[in-house]
Curated annotation (Swiss-Prot):
PANTHER family: MEMBRANE PROTEIN INSERTION EFFICIENCY FACTOR-RELATED. It is found in: Cell inner membrane. It comes from Chlorobium luteolum (strain DSM 273 / BCRC 81028 / 2530) (Pelodictyon luteolum). It comes from the Bacteria. This is Putative membrane protein insertion efficiency factor. The lineage of its organism: Bacteria, Pseudomonadati, Chlorobiota, Chlorobiia, Chlorobiales. Its main location: membrane. GO terms for cellular component: plasma membrane. It holds the Pfam family YidD. It is a peripheral membrane protein. SMART domains: Haemolytic. Coiled coil: none annotated. HAMAP family: UPF0161_YidD (MF_00386). Residues 66-86 are annotated as: Disordered. Keywords: Cell inner membrane, Cell membrane, Membrane.
């Protein structure tokens, strides 16, 4: 198992807790698809801790009343040799 997959287990658990317990208490308000929590889940499943944290934070900061929102998928790995995220 790749080390970043082990490190990402804690943030994944927190996001899943948020989605199962806290999110149902509030009306839907995310302006993007996938939702910010789904985006963060995918980011932590796809990227290392630091990149996933940055992508998730940047997405949450952009999710505000002044944003158009819309479709915003998690970017894939860049695939550059020697720049692996594991």
């Amino acid at each position: 198992m790749v080390i970043w997959k082990v490190v990402n287990k804690a943030p994944l658990a927190l996001i899943k807790f948020y989605r199962a317990i806290l999110s149902p208490m509030f009306p839907p308000s995310c302006r993007f698809y996938p939702t910010c929590s789904a985006y963060a889940l995918e980011a932590f499943e796809t990227h290392n801790f630091f990149k996933a944290s940055w992508l998730s934070l940047w997405r949450i900061l952009r999710c505000n009343p002044f944003s158009k929102g819309g479709f915003d998928p998690v970017p894939p790995h860049d695939g550059v040799p020697g720049k692996k995220e594991d």
